[in-house]
Amino acid sequence: MSLDTSSSAIHLQLPPTSSSLRPPSQITVHPSVIAQILTHHSRHSADSESTRVIGALMGNRSDNGQEVDIRSCFAVPHTEQGQQISVDRPFQQDMVNFLAKNGTKEVIVGWYASQKTVNSNSAIIQEYFSFETNPYPAVHLTVDTDIEESGKGLGVKGWVSQPLGLTSKSECSVFVPVPVSIKYADSERAALDLLTAPQPTPSPALPPLPTLSNSLSQLSSLIDQCLAYVQSVNNGSQTPDVEIGRYLLEGLGRWSASGNEDEGGVKAGLQDTLTVEYLSSLVRSQVELAGRLSLLQQPVAQQ
């Protein structure tokens, strides 16, 4: 499932000079990563000078480095004041060490930002994360949090930076788009469908007794239909169906008790419920009594 919005960019596969330095040609993202980025942006303070939030992307690379699989991420505090950028590196290192102690095998593969596209400061942050992913190039994800419901993707784009010219300065680089796709297991499809489904209209709550009455009426109607079917089969007016007969046999086989036994079971269940309620109230009384006795013993012990 592709996450890129419609774009006229051409993805070129240039011949690399070294296989370890070759930029990736495909980025796969787990759905939880996008959810974490959106959650991070929703908690962003409106009074902050930074209009976006950034964080580190954790994942793995393929053997040839052509595919980057992003499995998790975490927020990295930073500040932007014009061309001045400050990233909390100690916090980032503490998070990496903490995740490593908990058995996480993912490594930093790049960073994300909650903005529509890249800007001049993105090159500086890209250079910072390139030192973390060395010798591999760092990938960059931009998430458009203000995208409208146009049905053209989720506004997630992938980028890698390439040097431009002979100088090695961060300003002399260009961001090249990389295709991004979402990757999930079959067991996670149900949760994704539930999250992306339209919000259902809430139905007014019905009182308990009318709801029970409607349920019993529907059950009685179904029983009448089954009875009419059985009578028509016995009379020979309708051809019997083996599947329906099997379902009726399985349903009736669960209720082998007679009317007296059913009534006795209901009474026994009611008696058990009353017994449990009585014992719970008795225990509650004992606990309250023990607490009051302990309060009375404290002044005597002090004297």
UniProtKB/Swiss-Prot annotation:
Its main location: cytoplasm. The keyword Acetylation does not apply. PROSITE patterns: MPN (PS50249). It is found in: Cytoplasm. GO terms for cellular component: eukaryotic 43S preinitiation complex; eukaryotic 48S preinitiation complex; eukaryotic translation initiation factor 3 complex, eIF3e; eukaryotic translation initiation factor 3 complex, eIF3m. One of its GO terms (biological process) is translational initiation. Residues 1-25 are annotated as: Disordered. Residues 12-25 have a biased composition (Low complexity). Keywords: Cytoplasm, Initiation factor, Protein biosynthesis. Pfam families: JAB (PF01398), MitMem_reg (PF13012). Residues 1-10 have a biased composition (Polar residues). GO terms for molecular function: metallopeptidase activity; translation initiation factor activity; translation initiation factor binding. Residues 27-165 form the MPN domain. Belongs to the eIF-3 subunit F family. Component of the eukaryotic translation initiation factor 3 (eIF-3) complex, which is involved in protein synthesis of a specialized repertoire of mRNAs and, together with other initiation factors, stimulates binding of mRNA and methionyl-tRNAi to the 40S ribosome. The eIF-3 complex specifically targets and initiates translation of a subset of mRNAs involved in cell proliferation. Component of the eukaryotic translation initiation factor 3 (eIF-3) complex. This is Eukaryotic translation initiation factor 3 subunit F.
